């Protein structure tokens, strides 16, 4: 590699304000997106706190509970409460992302 090309590469790296930490433009974009998503989720949590009880339950509990009860009615296990509890615990991740 010619010295001029190496110098050009170094100036490009120096133009990036986070280059001293080794962050690329893609990583910077990802970090910015994560910050924005975190701000949105914190705003949503505040909104959930201000909702009336019925609306809060409709947005958070009812969707997973209805799905769990449908599976419970279909399978009719001998211990329905334990079945429903384990179903809710196993499937909570897919519903937490929606809130």
From Swiss-Prot:
There is a cross-link at residue 35 (Glycyl lysine isopeptide (Lys-Gly) (interchain with G-Cter in SUMO2)). GO terms for cellular component: Golgi apparatus; histone methyltransferase complex; MLL1 complex; MLL1/2 complex; MLL3/4 complex; nucleoplasm; nucleus; Set1C/COMPASS complex. It comes from the Eukaryota. GO terms for molecular function: identical protein binding; protein homodimerization activity. The gene is DPY30. Residues 1-26 are annotated as: Disordered. It comes from Homo sapiens (Human). Keywords: Acetylation, Chromatin regulator, Golgi apparatus, Isopeptide bond, Nucleus, Phosphoprotein, Transcription, Transcription regulation, Ubl conjugation. As part of the MLL1/MLL complex, involved in the methylation of histone H3 at 'Lys-4', particularly trimethylation. Histone H3 'Lys-4' methylation represents a specific tag for epigenetic transcriptional activation. May play some role in histone H3 acetylation. In a teratocarcinoma cell, plays a crucial role in retinoic acid-induced differentiation along the neural lineage, regulating gene induction and H3 'Lys-4' methylation at key developmental loci. May also play an indirect or direct role in endosomal transport. This is Protein dpy-30 homolog. The modification N-acetylmethionine is found at residue 1. Belongs to the dpy-30 family. GO terms for biological process: endosomal transport; transcription initiation-coupled chromatin remodeling.
């Amino acid at each position: 590699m010619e010295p001029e090309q190496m110098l050009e590469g170094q100036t490009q790296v120096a133009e990036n304000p986070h280059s001293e930490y080794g962050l690329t433009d893609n990583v910077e974009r990802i970090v910015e997106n994560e910050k924005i998503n975190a701000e949105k989720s914190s705003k949503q949590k505040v909104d959930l706190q201000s909702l009336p009880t019925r609306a809060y339950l409709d947005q958070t509990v009812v969707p997973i509970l209805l799905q769990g009860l449908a599976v419970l009615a279909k399978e009719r296990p001998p211990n329905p409460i334990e079945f429903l509890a384990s179903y809710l615990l196993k499937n909570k991740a897919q519903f937490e992302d929606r809130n």
